[in-house]
């Protein structure tokens, strides 16, 4: 297969924009409160030799294997691997409609998020099910025809990190999440890649981590020749 270098990263992060005087007051409130009341992160670091820590993997049946009936006869091109980084699914006690809808009760959401840990526990079945039955099912699965799909579970930053992205706590949360992605990718390179072309796919928070991954592993390195697109 001809290897094509096509570096085009689209980042769509679910940030909430706060405007006007009320927005500024809320922003100051968030910076004071979201950073000081969170409980410590819990849960183990992922062990990527264990299939539990992969939301999608060619070695188990998962929601990325879902294929529409009219495409079931299509053959996969096994010459390419897809490394997929899913978006934020760790919302804590918040309700998605309150977060995303203009008429949502934002202050109630903020109060619910104050005590939430900054990073997800990988044993949290609510978070895992949300990732599996949304992003992995409806996004990662579109790459079925391209080749094998690898999507690591990672200790993603809570949605509140996007409310105060400049805070030290949010930065630490994103760094921890990226460290898991990095370790997963290193495991994939060591045990699975074997010189295959690679597609890096991502969405929202996943794209933040994908950018760092591309910069660290592909920019100006021999691995860049294996990158099909990102």
Residue ranges of each PLM-predicted region?
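Gly/Ala-rich beta-loop-alpha elbow adjacent to hydrolase catalytic centers
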Residues: 202, 206
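A conserved short beta-strand
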Residues: 222-229
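Bacterial Sec-dependent N-terminal signal peptides
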Residues: 1-22
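N-terminal low-complexity, Ser/Thr- and acidic-residue-enriched intrinsically disordered segments
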Residues: 21-124, 129
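Short glycine-enriched nucleophile-adjacent loop
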Residues: 210-218
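A general structural signal for short secondary-structure junctions and capping/turn motifs
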Residues: 72-76, 140-143, 220-222
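Active-site catalytic motif of lipid deacylating hydrolases and related acyltransferases
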Residues: 37, 84-196
């Amino acid at each position: 297969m001809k290897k094509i270098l096509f570096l085009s990263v689209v980042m769509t992060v679910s940030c909430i924009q706060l405007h006007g005087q009320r927005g500024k007051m809320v922003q100051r409130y968030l910076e004071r409160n979201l950073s000081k009341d969170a409980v410590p992160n819990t849960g183990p670091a992922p062990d990527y030799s264990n299939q539990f820590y992969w939301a999608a993997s060619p070695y188990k049946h998962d929601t990325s294997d879902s294929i529409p009936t009219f495409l079931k006869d299509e053959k996969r091109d096994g010459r390419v691997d897809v490394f997929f980084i899913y978006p934020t699914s760790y919302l804590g006690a918040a309700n998605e409609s309150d977060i995303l809808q203009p008429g949502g009760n934002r202050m109630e959401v903020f109060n619910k998020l104050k005590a939430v840990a900054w990073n997800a526990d990988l044993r949290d079945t609510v978070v895992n099910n949300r990732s599996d039955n949304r992003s992995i099912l409806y996004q990662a699965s579109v790459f079925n025809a391209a080749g094998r799909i690898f999507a690591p579970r990672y200790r993603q930053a809570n949605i509140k990190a996007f409310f105060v992205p400049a805070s030290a706590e949010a930065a630490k949360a994103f760094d921890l999440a990226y460290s898991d992605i990095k370790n997963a990718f290193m495991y994939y390179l060591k045990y699975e890649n074997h010189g295959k072309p690679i597609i890096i796919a991502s969405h929202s928070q996943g794209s933040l981590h994908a950018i760092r991954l591309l910069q660290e592993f592909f920019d100006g390195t021999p691995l860049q020749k294996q990158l099909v697109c990102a």
